[in-house]
Amino acid sequence: ARGAKVIVVSSPSKQQTLLSLGADVVLNRNMDLLAELGENSVDVVIDLVAGEQWPTLLQLLKPKGRYGVSGAIGGALVELDVRTLYLKDLSFFGCTHLDEGVFARLVSLIEARAIRPVVAKVFDLQDIHQAQITFLEKLHTGKIVLRVP
């Protein structure tokens, strides 16, 4: 995390795994994050979910904070009071486009075992239905991989 304090919002069942992977704090996704962390308490939010917690995440951001998003499994449409954006001078960015060379660097780090992707389960392509069921149960930590023959 390059010196950053990493706060993860997840289900309680994943807490120990996330702590073992380097999270400093794991908070229950159903708790009142604003009461727990306080307004203007974080510099950066990386959101993979969006949905109903979205407005709270913006309240957590400090002025000049950065909000990055790379998923919307909690709901693709969110409402923004644009005053929050301009009064706090927030920056929003997507996290799906990689600059040239990033993927090759990532692969080289994996090959050198400097970083390790977390794989929850591997399914053969023919078992894609079971893979989807496993994904929807939300009990896994890490990626669900489909093995293509």
Predicted regions and their residues:
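Rossmann-fold NAD(P) dinucleotide-binding segment
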Residues: 52-62
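C-terminal hydrophobic helical "lid"/dimerization subdomain
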Residues: 100-149
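A general structural signal for well-ordered alpha-helical segments in protein cores
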Residues: 42, 54, 82, 103-107, ...
